[in-house]
Amino acid sequence: EIFNMKFDVIVGNPPYQLNVGNTTGNSCKAKSINHMFIEQAKKLNPRYLTMIVPSRWMTRSVEGIPDKWIDDMLNENKISVIYDFLNSQDCFPGVQIEGGVNYFLWDRDYKKECRYILNINKDTIYERVDFLNSNKTDIIIRDPFAINIIKKVNILNPNYIKNSEQNFSSIVSPKDFFTNKTLLTSSWKDYK
């Protein structure tokens, strides 16, 4: 409540990011701030919250959003539906947002699977109903072919994704391959 007002529904298109000083460089590396607006909206305890934001949070390929925030979004199971656009121009013609955009419906009283609709392009839409972190990857698998591969791998070995001794993640770096932050690295014993 604010001044004795109650909020049943909050709708927003929050600012996406803070410029990190590089106006001509890699804008997808700017510090994301949209999660702060989502958190503030949740504190108002609305019944429903819907916002449109860049999709990079779903794959953890974003600067500025804490892992805990992403974990909470994936595991609280309060998002009843996500409409995800791989190409932001399919949602906002003429606007390029790296990684695409999504809008979601967060429901305070909901605790079930999410209806995930992926707009691959104007003619191809993929839909599934599942918990956002059902494969325990700690990201939303956007690619419909990849999700089927991961499900098959999980059937063969349920611990494969989380056990770095069994999977590929122990020998490669997940991001920032060629930036000044880190070079391409590997712990593979035969890496030269």
Language-model-detected regions and their locations in the chain:
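SAM-dependent methyltransferase catalytic region
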Residues: 1-82, 87-91, 100, 104-116
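C-terminal substrate-recognition regions of SAM-dependent nucleic acid methyltransferases
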Residues: 5, 87-192
